[in-house]
Amino acid sequence: MDRRSFAAALTLGSAAALFGARSASAAPPPDSSPRARNVVLVHGAYADGSCWSDVIPYLQARGLNVASVQNPLRTLDEDCDFARRTLALMDGPTVLAAHSYSGIIATEVGVDPKVTALVYIAARAPDAGEDYTALAAQYPTPPASAGLVKGADGYAQLSESAFLNDFAQDVAPARARALCTVQGRISDELFNGRTTQAAWRDKPTFYAVSKNDRTINPDLERFMANRMNAKTTELDASHLSIVSKAREVADLIIEAAGV
């Protein structure tokens, strides 16, 4: 091999190595995801599966098979098991969409081969083994956390005032009160769990930031979305954008599904 050929080969080898390093640390482009026919929706803390009720009809209208997980909200491991059971019922390519706390669930169980894309809606998105609480502490504390009311049994929920003013402030008051009534109570162990893997490193990822979020700091949402190389949209919404901006949320999930 002459000097010119050797230099060309060295350049190509270096480029390939660099590309490989990048591929290992960032998700593939969102537009590379295959077409999905299923969607699994996962709710967060202070909520239940019915919070997706306004999103679901838009997805079904596009021919998607939709399932909404009901999380026990006792431990991360148990919630992940519930999500896995739902994924096991899917018959092929599936988009996994998560709101709020359940972004941690999607990060963990999204490695399932059926999952073709991840959609985070104002959601937590830690790296593998990362202490999310420590990450969130780097940003100003959002107001909703002051409204957490814990019972003698160790389970907690948001007060009605916090729910209406800091969790769902752009939802009609009557609807917000109804949603507050059905919110799941969380155990004092729920937020102690950590992921062991990060599905977003290998799966096309989408993120909807809630610009008016008073439950998760919007700048933290932007940081996580950027770190995941997610295709990001910003919504003029509260934390509960899956209700107040249901059409926009559905459109993002439909885009992730490729239908």
Task: Identify the role of each PLM range.
Residues 114-115, 119-151:
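Flexible "cap/lid" loop of the alpha/beta hydrolase fold
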Residues 187-228, 233-237, 242:
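Conserved serine/cysteine hydrolase catalytic core
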Residues 35-76:
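Conserved HGGG/HGGXW glycine-rich cap/lid loop of the alpha/beta-hydrolase fold
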Residues 5-26:
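N-terminal export signals
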Residues 154-199:
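Conserved alpha/beta-hydrolase catalytic His-Asp/Glu region
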